[in-house]
Structure formats: C-alpha cells, structure tokens
Design a protein with these regions (language model features):
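Active-site-flanking alpha-helical
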Residues: 23, 176, 202
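Short, well-structured alpha-helical segments
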Residues: 20, 161, 173-181
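An acidic, gly/pro-interrupted, aromatic-rich
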Residues: 9, 16, 29-167, 171-173, ...
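Alpha-helical secondary-structure segments
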Residues: 15-25
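Amphipathic alpha-helical segments that form the core helices of the histone-fold
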Residues: 1-9, 178-188
Length: 211
C-alpha cells in the first residue's frame, strides 16, 4: 500500500495510472496454476505465490449466468425488483429487492451479507442447498433454454462447440465433446437433452469458480 500510495502521488494523483500499475502487475495476473517447487516450500500459499481459487459470489454468479444466456438487462438505475423465484427477472442482481427483516432464501443460501448488521467480509459456505438450487431452479432452467435457443441454428458437434464457446470462452476438449455427444444421444426424452446439457454447463465448477 505504501508503494502504491507513493506511485499515486508521483504520477500526479492519476487514477488511470494507478489502475494500470495494479492490473499490469504480476500479482494481479496470477492464476491458480500449480507449481511443484513453490507448493513444496509453501503448501498453504501463505506468501501468495499463486491465486487462491474462489467461488463467485451470488451477484457475480447470477449475472454471469444471465450474460452467458444472453438475457442480462444492462439498464442502469431504476426501482429494485424481486428476483427470487422469478425465471424472467433479468436485471442485474445489484438491483434485487432486499427485505432487511426477511432476507430471501436465495440470498441466504449463497452467503449474501446480512443487510441489518455490519459485515466487513462475507463468509463462504458449502451446503447442500446450493447445488440443489442450481439443479432445480426455474431461473437456471430458463437460462439454459435461452442458451440452447441462441445456438438453435447449429447442429450436432457445432452446436456443442458453440455452447462451450459461449459459456467458457473456449472450445471443448476432445473428451468433453465425446461426453456431450454421448449424453445427447442417450438422454431420454431426446427433446430435453440440449436443455440439460446447457444447464450442466451453466452450473459447472468452471462457471462457478475463478481459477
């Protein structure tokens, strides 16, 4: 912090230069890639030689799913909106209605900070309700259907590739492509197979975690 403060003053209090210094630093660009030598010396990553893997918070998770499906409403400002249990609520989560006395269960499930108390840092929990929501939520199912609709013009392998590119910004690996094709061929009823594949992509660890 002292170094950044000195740089900030030396560069004429330029926020642009400060942000540039941060985002171009080696620390900011770290990934979760393992390094055998460093892992042996510092297995707990106390010295921060790699980025600690972390799960997306509720707002980032929900907005990412909406964005990938092509449904995210980017409108700014306006009244808050109840987003729990509404499959057609496409506004950014920051505009979700918060009842201080009765926090919606969706927010509690994904570790949203209590609005009626001071919270310096959110807790991160792993509980059964989280995957149950992702697998059974009408909201997630609606976004999966929308994702399939966006690649409806493509067929077979090309549709699978397009879904991976749209979701993960990459092509599927060979084994992923083979597994997806096998899943589509064997799923009953066939008409729902693509929706289920899309849902699996949307709720996978690659989507929910930052590496």
């Amino acid at each position: 912090l002292d170094h950044l403060a000195a740089e900030f003053v030396a560069n004429g209090w330029s926020m642009k230069q400060l942000i540039r210094s941060i985002v171009l630093s080696t620390t900011y660009q770290q990934g979760e890639t393992a390094h055998a030598e460093y892992a042996e010396r510092d297995p707990s990553n106390r010295l921060l030689w790699q980025m600690n893997r972390r799960r997306l918070d509720l707002e980032s998770m929900r907005d990412s799913v909406l964005a990938v499906a092509g449904n995210l409403d980017l409108k700014q400002s306006g009244r808050s909106e109840k987003i729990e249990n509404k499959s057609n609520a496409n506004r950014r989560t920051i505009y979700g209605f918060i009842d201080r006395q009765n926090l919606p269960s969706l927010f509690r499930t994904f570790d949203f900070a209590g609005p009626d108390t001071t919270c310096g840092r959110r807790f991160t929990t792993t509980i059964p309700q989280q995957p149950l929501y992702l697998l059974n939520s009408p909201f997630i199912e609606a976004q999966a259907k929308r994702l399939v609709e966006s690649v409806q013009a493509l067929k077979g392998e090309e549709r699978i590739r397009a879904m991976f590119r749209q979701t993960y910004q990459r092509d599927p690996k060979d084994w992923e492509l083979d597994s997806a094709e096998l899943f589509i061929d064997q799923f009953v009823p066939y008409a729902a197979a693509w929706d289920r594949l899309a849902q699996a992509l949307l709720v996978s660890n690659e989507m929910m975690f930052i590496d």
